[in-house]
Amino acid sequence: ILIPENVKVKAEIIAKEPGIIAGIEEAKILLESLGIKAEAKIKDGQKTSCGKTILKLEGNARTILAVERTLLNLISRMSGIATQTNRIVEKVKAAGYRTKIACTRKTAPGLEYFDKKAVWLGGGDTHRLHLDDMILIKDNHIAIIGSIKEAVKIAKEKASFSKKIEAEVSSVDEAIEAARAGADIIMLDNFSPKQVREAVKKLEEEGIRDKVLVEVSGRINEENVLEFASIGVDIISLGILTHSVKALDLSLEVKQVTA
């Protein structure tokens, strides 16, 4: 109603706070599919500062305004994920630990690819992109099958040799059972730092620590991540990277009416 049909404008997407930018590649594809010229002023995975232009747009004013919110939502969410991931990754590195920081499958419906790509751009590990990327034996599988040992046995018999097997455990005894059964990765789910130490120590005493990767997950955040990294686990997976993300503050501003 307000904007004449053939008005053309130049606009810019501007960062309102510092962070790691993600979603530029997807934004360009979206804009170009709508006939809007898009010029990236920063690459995915790079840091931006407050007030910096990250993307320039040129084209039909109605189209740009119609896609504005979708565009900002996508880049803001992905950049927020990348920024938080990078902050945690760098915190662990700065403390001298080599623990991998990974996300989980607790992503927004329909946005798993974008969420996980943002984690990767922030320096984190994507864990599984799809259910069939790896065999993850969880508590409900064990409840149905009867035991971790039997679940691992079935997985090893039926799966390709190329598939790693991870077992989610809820006690030190289950961790030992899973490792002895031949699981490649042991996930200590909702363990306290004290319980993680006990599990790692027990695996060492049994002579099987070097045969498995140890992942911890559940109730871990930016504040307590170093408590877990200091124990010597291999992977820390955090649901907060994607399910509780704070979007990076961005805005779209029309800079010039060209026609």
Specify the residue positions occupied by each region the protein language model found.
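Short, basic/aromatic-enriched C-terminal tail that caps enzymatic domains
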Residues: 244-258
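Acidic/glycine-rich phosphate/pyrophosphate-binding loops and surrounding catalytic core
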Residues: 1-181, 185, 197-202, 213-215, ...
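Short secondary-structure boundary segments
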Residues: 190, 218, 240
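Short acidic, glycine/proline-enriched helix-loop-strand junctions
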Residues: 205-212, 255-259
